[in-house]
């Protein structure tokens, strides 16, 4: 059955791969990005029809509210929500600027809280499924990523708690925690050295994370779970 899937951070990386896979499955996509042109261009490139690209900065509540007002008026009921918008500002804690800390927390944690709040209101009458994007760093921690790790660890606790709150309304909430994936965030890493820490011996691809997300979105008896998609990286951290 075709459903309306709302994908934040859908114009690149994991979010783009998720949008493409969901469209291939026959779902209608509302794709959101801070860059309106990128959102619209990506939406137009997806298989199928009637996809929509909108601009939204998830760290700003008024923009999230405006986006969902548009979705509610023009698209109807939301079946799936994917929270793939995220940033990092990696640095040792003593070298981290407070404005960077706030930017990471507001985008990675508060942003997903705001989008979930708006989506749940839409889903209350008919149910739905939400997948948040965390990180293996949120599970295990990593030197030089204290703030990013905190934002993703907080998202895990939020995901489990929200799953408990809305299960009675047939709304499922899960989280995918990727490891090292070929995206803009990992473009500057020394890949040859990094893969030595991964049991499967390679970086993952956005499409592989998208497959895990699709599994959670379409699995009717799974909620409150954290699914690591990391090639076994957590085994050696």
UniProtKB/Swiss-Prot annotation:
Q: Which UniProt keywords apply?
A: Fatty acid biosynthesis, Fatty acid metabolism, Lipid biosynthesis, Lipid metabolism, Mitochondrion, NAD, NADP, Oxidoreductase
Compartment(s) of residence: Mitochondrion matrix
Instruction: Name the residues annotated as catalytic in the UniProt entry.
Output: 148 (proton acceptor)
The terms describing its cellular component in GO are: mitochondrial matrix; oxidoreductase complex
SUPFAM superfamilies given for it? NAD(P)-binding Rossmann-fold domains
Entry GO MF terms: 3-oxoacyl-[acyl-carrier-protein] reductase (NADPH) activity; oxidoreductase activity, acting on the CH-OH group of donors, NAD or NADP as acceptor; quinone binding
Q: What PROSITE patterns has UniProt attached to this entry?
A: ADH_SHORT
Q: Where does substrate bind?
A: 135
Q: Which family does it belong to?
A: Belongs to the short-chain dehydrogenases/reductases (SDR) family.
Function description: The heterotetramer with HSD17B8 has NADH-dependent 3-ketoacyl-acyl carrier protein reductase activity, and thereby plays a role in mitochondrial fatty acid biosynthesis. Within the heterotetramer, HSD17B8 binds NADH; CBR4 binds NADPD. The homotetramer has NADPH-dependent quinone reductase activity. Both homotetramer and the heterotetramer have broad in vitro substrate specificity and can reduce 9,10-phenanthrenequinone, 1,4-benzoquinone and various other o-quinones and p-quinones.
Q: Provide the assembly information.
A: Homotetramer (in vitro). Heterotetramer with HSD17B8; contains two molecules each of HSD17B8 and CBR4.
UniProt xrefs under PANTHER family: 3-OXOACYL-[ACYL-CARRIER-PROTEIN] REDUCTASE, SHORT-CHAIN DEHYDROGENASES/REDUCTASES FAMILY MEMBER
| Annotated protein name in UniProt | Carbonyl reductase family member 4
The record lists the organism as Danio rerio
